[in-house]
UniProtKB/Swiss-Prot annotation:
Protein name, entry field: 2,3-diketo-L-gulonate reductase
Organism: Salmonella newport (strain SL254)
Cysteines joined through disulfide linkages: none
Record-annotated active site: 44 (proton donor)
Phylogenetic classification of the source organism: Bacteria, Pseudomonadati, Pseudomonadota, Gammaproteobacteria, Enterobacterales
Subunit structure: Homodimer.
């Protein structure tokens, strides 16, 4: 089925207000969930909303909490999220990193005691739209086996890097081949994964999303490389925020909350003039996209460039929502 942006935002807002969330908070949170979905990231927008409400109902998320600054060291700040709403807090932290970068050239905010930020790419994009390089990542509960294991001991720990090119170039990737949200998207669509995404119960690589969702043997991207990157991202976020590691979140909490996150903004224009910046970025993009294609029918892709088209299509034709997901939201 298809819905308009306003219909989708209204559905989110209704559910949030039914939980006695303050009007302004409910409006901003509903807006962010709807924008994420409109951008084509269904896995962390509309599909994730029922899970968000479950955590809200369970008390994992404290909707009226106010993030507090703990430490300030010039370009680096440490904050405590107080388990406030994840996407609203993350937006505020990237805004703060941008403010610090305006003063110092670079700004870094380390956040502890946070909740799931939904679409991490929103915050990298937020920085790039203002002309900054945006880098952010989060740890998580243990949902992926480290390389060589079959028991979950590391997080998917998504990493975002956004560049202020035209259009914006952005990598938004979990340390697994696919996020659990994308496994769900493919399962609901009745599709196999395009490449192996995990192991089946016999330890064989599989493209079946439902199997991986059930046994939790998701595959690290790049095998041992994704496993290693997940571990060091967790270590950095834990140390800089003085927050919880994947181990602590997994062993001490009843669900995924109280995670640690990093937000970095770099003001490129303090280092290079705008015309030179744009020319250098365009040369990089042209060099890549003019390579001989392996398949004449498949374009060479630059990361994040597809979001401009997805957003335009959804605004023109309506946002496609899975019927079963929409039914869940209507029932909340």
């Amino acid at each position: 089925m298809k819905v308009t942006f306003e219909e989708l935002k209204g559905a989110f807002y209704r559910v949030l207000r039914s939980r006695n969330i303050a009007e302004d908070t409910a409006d901003k949170c509903a807006e962010m969930f709807a924008r994420t979905t409109e951008s084509g990231v269904y896995s962390h927008g509309v599909n994730r909303f029922p899970r968000f409400i479950q955590q809200l109902d369970n008390g994992d998320i404290i909707p009226d909490a106010k993030p507090q600054r703990v430490t300030s060291l010039g370009a680096i700040e440490q904050w405590d999220a107080q388990r406030a709403i994840g996407n609203l807090t993350a937006k505020k932290m990237m805004d703060r990193a941008i403010e610090l970068a305006s003063d110092h050239g670079i700004g870094l905010v380390a956040l502890r005691n946070a909740n799931h930020w939904m679409r991490g790419g929103s915050y990298g994009w937020q920085a790039a739209e203002k002309g900054y390089i945006g880098i952010c990542w989060t740890n998580s509960i243990a949902v992926m086996p480290p390389w060589g294991a079959k028991e979950c001991r590391i997080g998917t720990n998504p990493l975002i890097v956004a560049i202020p090119s035209t259009p914006i170039t952005m990598v938004d990737m979990s340390m697994s081949m696919f996020s659990y949200g994308m496994l769900e998207v493919n399962r609901l669509a009745g599709r196999e994964l395009p490449v192996d995404g995990g192991f089946d119960d016999n330890g064989q690589l599989t493209k079946e999303p439902g199997v991986i969702e059930k046994n939790r043997r998701i595959l690290p991207m790049g095998y041992w490389k994704g496993s290693g990157l997940s571990i060091v991202l967790d270590m950095i976020a834990t140390l800089l925020s003085n927050g919880s590691s994947v181990a602590e979140v997994t062993q001490e909490n009843s669900d995924e909350y109280g995670v640690s996150q990093i937000f970095i903004a770099i003001e490129v224009d303090k280092l290079i003039d705008g015309a030179t910046r744009d020319a250098k970025l365009q040369r990089i993009m042209d060099f890549i996209t003019t390579a001989e294609r392996a398949d004449d029918n498949v374009a060479i892709r630059l990361p994040g460039h597809e979001f401009t088209k997805l957003l335009d299509d959804n605004r023109r034709h309506g946002i496609t929502i899975d019927d079963s997901v929409w039914a869940k939201i209507q029932a909340l």
